[in-house]
Structures are given as structure tokens and as C-alpha cells.
């Protein structure tokens, strides 16, 4: 997931709010939860997040990504699955992921009701190249391994 930065909204990451510049988005713009939702959907061969939360729907404007995640967990029948591991890469030059890693991992652990040891979050930069390097945007990639419970 990738979003352009915006000074008109707070920063949401992994369901947590930080008092700094957030993202331009129809929802709260939480790149971590958006990428996690897409990874969950993809792991069970479902359509992408935009299919379930179309940005053209007025009812979805400003929706919290934690609410999106709850719906996605129902759609994929999460209670019948077990998370083996989640690997999250946040690509940004706006902040240091290492300064927030523990609280982000803790919140994802709570949201998914899994052991924190199954979650890995790392930060990467683009060495000042492109939109992310120019601090205009940030992105997140998520890989998840699930098995039947």
C-alpha cells in the first residue's frame, strides 16, 4: 500500500494514531493495516481491499482501518486459520520505524490475537529516490503465512 503524505490528517500506523503528518486517503490511510488486509485477502484468494471498501462509497469516507481489518477477518473466516508469521516492511523517509517497532508489533498482536513473536516489522528507505525518497509518500508491504487451524 502507498499513500501520499498530508498535513490535514494524523498519522495512523498499525491501528495507532501518532501526532504528526498523516496520509491523504479516503479512509484513515493506515498503510500498515491496508497492506495487512490485502495480504490476508490474498492468502485465501479473495479480491483486494478496494473491492470490499470502495472509495466511491460515501459510507466508507474516513473509515478507520481497524474497522476494515475486523470486516476482512470475518470475510476470510480468520477463526478457522492460524498465523504462522507476518513480515511487514514499511518504506519511508519520514520517520524511523525502529523507534515505533515494538508498539506497532504489540498492537498488531492484539488486533489479530497472536503471539508477538510471529510478527516482524522492519523499515526501509529509498535512499532519497522517488516520491518516497522526496518524503511525499510512504508505503508498506506485507507477507503473511497462514495455515488451517
Regions found by a protein language model. Give the residues of each.
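Mid-sequence acidic-hydrophobic segments that form the walls
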Residues: 75, 107, 111, 145
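RNase III-family endoribonuclease catalytic core
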Residues: 2-101, 112
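Short, structured patches in soluble enzyme cores that scaffold and shape functional sites
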Residues: 4, 15, 123, 144-146
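C-terminal edge-of-domain segments
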Residues: 132-149
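Short, conserved loop-to-beta-strand elements that form functional interface hotspots
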Residues: 87-96, 101-132
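Short, surface-exposed, polar/charged, turn-prone segments marking secondary-structure boundaries
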Residues: 39-40, 113-118, 147-149
